[in-house]
């Protein structure tokens, strides 16, 4: 009754409701509330999903084609450890093959912290990872001793964002996008290294051809300049690299004013599908 009578009522959901048994129904129910109560497309309302935002798109590191085409859902990786060769396309949703040939024996987890506390059954997952005859090696790269890092055979400590140069966009900032040119405010401590250095060293040990293919002969700073130059080529309104570095923060308002979810349905009463 309170939700139905409140105007506006801002209704949104995070990333938790669907992470449980039949959680997709919970997610759908939350999304239905603003539709039923007339809170879609009004000031202060929302669509029931995560809020939208205007952002300045950044250029990310190019990825080579993955030669491995077989895929499983992100939720079934524990099954792939325990009974990988038994998993099939029909029963378990394996993609790219009729069945898995081998179980998961190695996990590389970068800044994820999803090994334990974002899975459905912590105790079951704990027991699976305790058996080193199953998943034999876990590598975790992070800034903190997370729950996932505690299960790692090898922990590689990454640098924090305040310890290295980078360009990052806004996350959820509403109707104004921005770029921040990060500059170190403190020197790296102890033996921690940036992820690009870590991956470059791994590539180097796989062979000089792999190292060259991965780095393309660029340092981390050279990659940053190269990727930003591609951004400027697509968006000439952006300041130059050196100007952005001097500014620190570049802001831009949404040229359309604001984003309206299901705009066609709200303005011309088209049905929401």
Language model features: what each stretch is:
Residues 1-23, 27, 36-42, 49-57, ...:
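Non-catalytic alpha/beta scaffold blocks inside enzyme catalytic domains
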